Amino acid sequence: MTQSRLHAAQNALAKLHERRGNTFYPHFHLAPPAGWMNDPNGLIWFNDRYHAFYQHHPMSEHWGPMHWGHATSDDMIHWQHEPIALAPGDENDKDGCFSGSAVDDNGVLSLIYTGHVWLDGAGNDDAIREVQCLATSRDGIHFEKQGVILTPPEGIMHFRDPKVWREADTWWMVVGAKDPGNTGQILLYRGSSLREWTFDRVLAHADAGESYMWECPDFFSLGDQHYLMFSPQGMNAEGYSYRNRFQSGVIPGMWSPGRLFAQSGHFTELDNGHDFYAPQSFVAKDGRRIVIGWMDMWESPMPSKREGWAGCMTLARELSESNGKLLQRPVHEAESLRQQHQSISPRTISNKYVLQENAQAVEIQLQWALKNSDAEHYGLQLGAGMRLYIDNQSERLVLWRYYPHENLDGYRSIPLPQGDMLALRIFIDTSSVEVFINDGEAVMSSRIYPQPEERELSLYASHGVAVLQHGALWQLG
């Protein structure tokens, strides 16, 4: 049965792929061949390849019964699509193979995922069953389901997104949950094998009324600290923060096996753009801690659905720690995308300075002299629909998008960093922009939807002058 369901899913995907349009399809980000994509799953280096699985609906560009899509890469940048890895339909995953993770268990690629069943009709979140399941593969392509390995504690129904790792000769698992009081929490388990698990403790939980569910947990050490990374649902916006439908971020602290997680800071968003959710981390072949997120947001318009697909991933980002602060930089492998180079000489800008008439896939580096720039706002624009600018009056860096025909309008912003200089590294793809600020101190990621004729890339300044100290641009391919 499983094979026939996989075969049917692959056939449906092939049919959808035949009619997929490319108006917004990315040049250098991982997106589904067709159909729907959301959370990254099972990110791992295995058998001399990077593997990225993901939540996938191959029958439609809309969310539906979740499969696990699959892609592989030798550099985390150039991805090759593989056959669909998991299809729902067995007793314990009848209505979805929800998110999870991957580990190498003595040469066996092991996927730990959530089996989801609707108990009272599809979409009724008040009546579900969620259990953790195992699927295994020796070749890294074809998987056999091994059944349920963990059931939820008494009184808990929402119980999903297992992230598994090995530490101190023990398997560990974090799972996102909603307690009976509708409060988000992360549960920690320890295992003698991938099939035998014991509850360790509630690793962390929301304050009452703060958020009702904590999804997609991850737990890892970096520098001198541990980071609990997760995606809370139900947080209220506070000023400029938490403006998206749902958030993703980290809590720092100290932990060792058998101990409490001693939090040393508050929840901080990982990305300050419009579109970032469900990040998952993994260890690269050389030991770097890498994170990839879903570059979309629940309940947002997704214009690419008109062309038979939806969803894409962020660039792979290397995490590092500096003075207790988490930094995110594009993996150095991203430089392999660079083709034609265009230097941007230092200049004073008082109106518009065109960089490219038709920017499809580019990397731009800009260094602004904040103290010497008196324009009310100045920065980079793509067509009339996307601006990344410094607002001198509010002293904030603003990422604004305006596509009224797509029902998309609004901005995200962060405080300008202290100091005289602002360094920006910007990746623009067909339908996305990712901005790395001051060598990874902050990141802003958003989907954008310019029409093909709306891709003029320019620098600009309004009501004053802006001083560019350094600039560079690369075509990417």
Curated annotation (Swiss-Prot):
Pfam families: Glyco_hydro_32C (PF08244), Glyco_hydro_32N (PF00251)
Name of the protein in question: Sucrose-6-phosphate hydrolase
Catalytic residues (positions): 39
Chief subcellular location: cytoplasm
Catalytic reaction list: Hydrolysis of terminal non-reducing beta-D-fructofuranoside residues in beta-D-fructofuranosides
Function comment: Enables the bacterium to metabolize sucrose as a sole carbon source.
Alphabetical list of CDD domains matching this protein: GH32_FFase
Ligand binding (substrate): 36-39, 55, 63, 98-99, 160-161, 215, 298
Pathway(s) this gene product operates in, as recorded in its UniProt entry: Glycan biosynthesis; sucrose metabolism
